[in-house]
Regions:
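Detector for C-terminal structural segments
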Residues: 24-25, 93, 112, 298, ...
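A structural "hinge/loop" feature
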Residues: 99, 104-124, 144, 227-235, ...
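Aromatic- and charge-enriched surface segment that lines or borders ligand/interaction sites
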Residues: 146-192, 217, 350-353, 412-415, ...
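Ligand-site clamp/hinge motif
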Residues: 162, 167, 291-295, 322-373, ...
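Surface-exposed binding/hinge segments that line
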Residues: 197-282
Length: 683
């Protein structure tokens, strides 16, 4: 459900490249640590002020008349479209652009890597979340929903839709589209065999019901105060364009999808239709027809809609004529006519095109190791480079599998807190930071950014993360790992020879394999033998879910808001690398998987409880979760809060309303956190 599903390879930095960027790294790294005085140093302009456009909610400031793109005005004139006032409805979403009222026109050029790179479009162009976060990531605001209300007991969340809002084909967008999704899609076991965790509270299902055409309610059996956060995030509901392909999303265009559903014809009829269209089942057909990236005919409520699908060499999205977004001067948004994404067969080609100035705005798949060359070519390429440090905590982390059980000796050590802390003290983080992230990361704990909602406190920023070989060796000795072989490596206590730790890596946004190889060399000083096992992403995931990995290299996706994304630093499902069997136990309420030890159960209980309590109590519990997790060090951090993952932003200088810095997180869906429908071409 997030970008962790769709990664591309990065590349090793040469020594020459590192040296060329020495000055930049030296100046930029302190800024990431929050030192304001670094702004007068060379390279400081690369990390600017966190900023974004504002929603206009004051009735006195709402526009009284409306305008539209010239091409849409021509269609209205020809009688092929209703007037703009009828298309945007009675409650348009009004945005005050960051800097300017923009101009219509132009094609935004981007790169993508193939049919699995769906998040590329979701993040840039397909925002249809009911609720959203503001540009700081700390405040929930309306989006395609006009507003929301949580009952005093937390059991009913009421969503107020925008009256008169329409799907991209002109049909009304109403509460019926929510009821259709809930009753005929979500509750159909062929389409959705397993309940979505966030559609339950304390293991009990929640329901969706219609109040009137513009009002829908999510009704829970127990208090569910966190539901607005869930709807604003990337959990699988409240966001049709991203999750329709999985029959999730929270709403769907009933008037279009009924033709592919057996209830409105017959099982035989939709099965026949599926066979004609070369799908192996009606379920596969239904999900394909509900895929906003693959089906140009699908009605959507996004700013742009697909007209040439993602499974072609050029993925094209065009302005939605029924877009509900409007600027503060009354211009229907988006300003930009269309988005054209060109297939890049590999990451190297995509980055070369960025360097050559062939993209108008691109951060996804931009390799941080290319930063020196990007900077050298800014003027020639007609672009500017911005850096957006993440707030997710560990960009590179060693996720220690707490439920590993294939080797009792290894399982014992992975499950021993002092052993994990000793491994941490044996990592020279600054060496990794300078070599692979150009010195732009933080070398402390896996804690999220200081300005995030659930930052546990300054005392946790560096907990157990000092590079201290002497301390690491002493801790390992105290654990009884005192015997060594002729090469100085520690021996297993069961007589099985050298103690070896398997480090699983895959090709991703960051050079996990190269980082792992460096750590293997560093661990020689503490007598620990690490063995890197690089594999294809799909195989790595399969081994993870089978509980076969020991230590898994990964990014701590979305950890800056554990209620907006699977937290990843403790297990809540079978895809969490710190303990998949424990995650299955949590997700199944103990019916499956393996019961975790007390400390992890304590974290799980606090997390489960937090969904059902008001904001202040939820914040307190979340900070407690972080404190325990950081002290236990189930994730051994290496480099944190850097711009390495989707944080090197290449923007053409003729694009307007571009923020100096974006909130960069799996929860934020950057760049759309900056409301890309307000971006425009100055010339």
């Amino acid at each position: 459900m997030s970008d962790r599903e769709e990664h591309e390879p990065t590349h090793r930095l040469s020594r020459r490249t590192v040296l060329r960027l020495g000055l930049l790294a030296a100046s930029a790294a302190p800024m990431l640590a929050g030192r304001a005085h670094a702004q007068d140093k060379p390279g400081a302009h690369l990390i600017g002020k966190l900023e974004g456009p504002e929603l206009v909610t004051d009735p006195a400031k709402l526009p009284k008349s409306f305008k539209e793109a010239p091409e849409l005005a021509e269609l209205v004139k020809a009688g092929k479209l209703p007037p703009v006032e009828q298309r945007i409805g009675q409650d348009p979403l009004v945005i005050k652009p960051l800097r300017d009222i923009g101009k219509y026109g132009g094609t935004w050029r981007r790169g993508f890597t193939g049919p699995f790179d769906t998040s590329n479009g979701h993040r840039a162009a397909q925002n249809d979340k009911l609720l959203y976060f503001d540009h700081t990531g700390t405040k929930i605001v309306p989006n395609i929903a006009r507003g929301w209300e949580v009952s005093p007991d937390g059991r009913v969340t009421t969503i107020f839709l925008r009256r008169g809002m329409r799907w991209s084909d002109g049909q009304p967008f109403t509460a019926d589209d929510f009821v259709f999704w809930f009753e005929e899609v979500y509750q159909n076991k062929e389409l959705v065999p397993t309940p979505l965790p966030v559609m339950t509270i304390n293991g009990k299902p929640i329901a969706v019901r219609k109040v009137d055409a513009a009002t829908v309610q999510f009704v829970a059996p127990d208090p569910y105060f966190a539901l607005p956060t869930v709807l604003a995030s990337v959990w699988g509901i409240g966001h049709h364009a991203r999750y329709g392909r999985d029959a999730l999303g929270g709403f769907a265009p009933a008037h279009y999808l009924k033709q592919f559903h057996p209830k409105w014809s017959s099982k035989d009829e939709v099965t026949r239709k599926a066979a004609e269209m070369k799908f192996d089942s009606w379920v596969a057909l239904f999900k394909n027809r509900n895929d906003a990236c693959r089906n140009p005919d699908l009605p959507v409520v996004t700013p742009w809609k697909t007209i040439s699908p993602i499974n072609t060499p050029t993925w094209i999205l065009e302005r939605n004529p029924y877009s509900v977004w409007v600027d503060s001067a009354g211009h229907q948004l988006p300003y930009i006519d269309r988005i054209r994404m060109t297939l890049a067969e590999n990451l190297e080609l995509l980055n070369l095109r960025a360097i050559a100035g062939e993209y108008d705005s691109q951060a996804r798949h931009i390799d941080i190791s290319k930063l020196p060359v990007l900077l050298e070519n800014q003027k020639k390429g007609g672009y500017r480079v911005y850096l957006d440090p993440s707030t997710q905590g560990a960009d590179v982390g060693l996720f220690c599998n707490q439920s590993f059980d294939r080797d009792p000796e290894i399982a014992k050590w992975l499950g021993t807190r002092e052993f994990r802390i000793a491994l941490s003290h044996g990592i020279h983080r600054q060496q990794v930071n300078e070599t692979f992230v150009l010195g732009l990361g933080q070398t402390g704990s896996a804690a999220p950014g200081e300005r995030t909602l659930y930052f546990p406190g300054p005392e946790y920023k560096t907990l157990h993360c000092a590079y201290d070989v002497k301390k690491a060796n002493a801790m390992l000795d105290q654990l009884g790992l005192t015997k060594k072989d002729s090469e100085g490596y520690r021996l297993r206590t069961d007589g099985g020879g050298r103690l070896r730790l398997a480090l699983t890596t895959y090709l991703g946004f960051l050079p996990f394999t190269q980082v792992a190889e460096m750590i293997v060399q560093q661990w020689k000083q503490i007598g620990i033998r690490g063995e890197v096992q690089e594999m294809e992403r799909g195989l790595a995931t399969a081994r993870l879910r089978a509980n076969e990995h020991q230590i898994y290299f990964e990014t701590q996706w979305g950890a800056d808001n554990m209620f907006g994304h699977s937290p990843f630093f403790f297990p809540i499902d079978g895809g969490t690398p710190v303990g998949p069997l424990y995650g299955v136990w949590y997700a199944s309420a103990g019916a499956q998987g393996k019961q975790p030890p007390p400390r992890m159960r304590e974290v799980m209980e606090k997390y489960r409880k937090a969904f059902g309590v008001p904001d202040a109590e939820r914040t307190r519990l979340a900070k407690e979760v972080w404190k325990i997790a950081l002290d236990e060090m189930w994730v051994i951090p290496v480099v944190s809060n850097s711009p390495a993952s989707q944080g090197v932003r290449v923007i053409k200088t003729n694009m307007g309303n571009i923020p100096e810095r974006l909130w960069n997180s799996a929860v934020s869906d950057n760049p759309h956190i900056a409301h890309t429908e307000t971006w425009y071409f100055k010339s």
